[in-house]
From Swiss-Prot:
This is Pyruvate decarboxylase. Belongs to the TPP enzyme family. Mg(2+) binds at residues 450, 477, 479. Keywords: Decarboxylase, Lyase, Magnesium, Metal-binding, Thiamine pyrophosphate. Its cofactor is Mg(2+); thiamine diphosphate. InterPro entries: DHS-like_NAD/FAD-binding_dom, PDC/IPDC-like, THDP-binding, Thiamin_PyroP_enz_cen_dom, Thiamin_PyroP_enz_TPP-bd_dom, TPP_enzyme_TPP-bd, TPP_PDC_IPDC, TPP_PYR_PDC_IPDC-like. Gene3D superfamilies: 3.40.50.970, TPP-binding domain.
Amino acid sequence: MATDIATRDLRKPIDVAEYLFRRLREVGVRAVHGVPGDYNLVALDYLPKCDLHWVGNCNELNAGYAADGYARINGMSALVTTFGVGELSALNAIAGAYSEFVPIVHIVGQPHTKSQKDGMLLHHTLGNGDFNVFTRMSADISCTLGCLNSTHEVATLIDNAIRECWIRSRPVYISLPTDMVTKKIEGERLDTPLDLSLPPNDPEKEDYVVDVVLKYLHAAKKPVILVDACAIRHRVLDEVHEFVEKSGLPTFVAPMGKGAVDETHKNYGGVYAGTGSNPGVREQVESSDLILSIGAIKSDFNTTGFSYRIGQLNTIDFHSTYVRVRYSEYPDINMKGVLQKIVQRMGNLNVGPVSPPSNLLPDNEKASTEQAITHAWLWPTVGQWLKEKDVVITETGTANFGIWDTRFPAGVTAISQVLWGSIGYSVGACQGAALAAKEQGRRTVLFVGDGSFQLTLQEVSTMIRNNLNPIIFVICNEGYTIERYIHGWEAVYNDIQPWDFLNIPVAFGAKDKYKGYKVTTRDELRELFANEEFASAPCLQLVELHMPRDDCPASLKLTAESAAERNKSL
């Protein structure tokens, strides 16, 4: 077994935990989410010294969701849990972050290395002496593991994990045994900031791919740009915006790409999701002779049940690790460098005018005297109320699909979990996002269904504790609407117990730091949206938004029907 480095040989000795937390602060992390446990307590003592804020969540699952939301606004996040019981509680959230390319550094406090070596029968174990079993469980949902068991390699493992987390935009796992927390290592390397730059593409290969792309782009008569989630996750939005601006091409987003493009831009055409799209959007995208697809994730909920009608022969796919031109794939090529060179070398394109975007109310909704708040009326109306640079979070279900019809002001960030789709995610994510947004002076708005809210609403307590002021709309429609449309319309398992949502923040100790509203008609919601004090978000606000039980966005209905058919036929 390797011996520890003698402290006297270190030029700038520093404790392992301090090194780890200082690196996290260096890359922009300002708050750490998690739940304390006896194997991580001493490590948590280092947070104040490293100028990191401890959030302290109600449970590890919610903490994981919160870390996800924080990372989507801040760029990266950190989560601390304890061995076994704590880390396993967070795994659903970590899996979602892995699925959706969200960079979280998951730090797990572990028992003393000698206890592990001796196979002691400790609490939080399976009782079989295997102390690596939980690490193995995390391996498939982490892009790298950093097991800090020896001072000789600790700094390298920490630096590598943080860099991989950033570059690959996925969670990493760092185990920190109790005896390693206070061990001394060389701190001199902290004087050199981590290199978080992407590995450069091979210049010759990159130039060849750019030439191929430009050949098809200049030959196309009706090219369009389609932007999706991985353009956001892999940080190519500057390149995308420059491409959109310089090319003048009609530009659309997939549902997971909402917010990736300035929706007030003259080139912006709307959300393309196959059969769930606005008819004009669908016609323009599907009649195009060249789709420049940037960061696509073609999942079922992102495509209205795999209903894309665009062929690969007319598509160029840009991704973080490859570019695919029609049926030819070019591996080990990052889209960032390729997009930069395309913009530099593109020149003028021969394209026609872009159709003006529209998310106006449907004619039947404009003429309606109905007072019930329907999805067809709600979501375009929300777009008229939102502010520039808002952070808008939507829960899996009606909100996730309804937001497709909301036209965002400039600079709005959208957060949802379309691929992983864990109900309840949005509440924890709202806490994390609101914390990061507060640091940026931005407003946070959450739309969550009543069923999903019941899973994770403890994090409203954490919002109150951290003086966060999100505006929370709870869509009250008597249960799991998305699941009713898939199967079991009248089934009791899709029902929920009605809760008095407006009094929950009071039970959590909000007192004078909270305002609640109950809205049942369109006029009441119009009045609330016109209330300047409400819009200024002076404190945490919760709105019970009552909607018909059987109403849902048309895109959700189509997707649910597709899911039901697959469940029966596969």
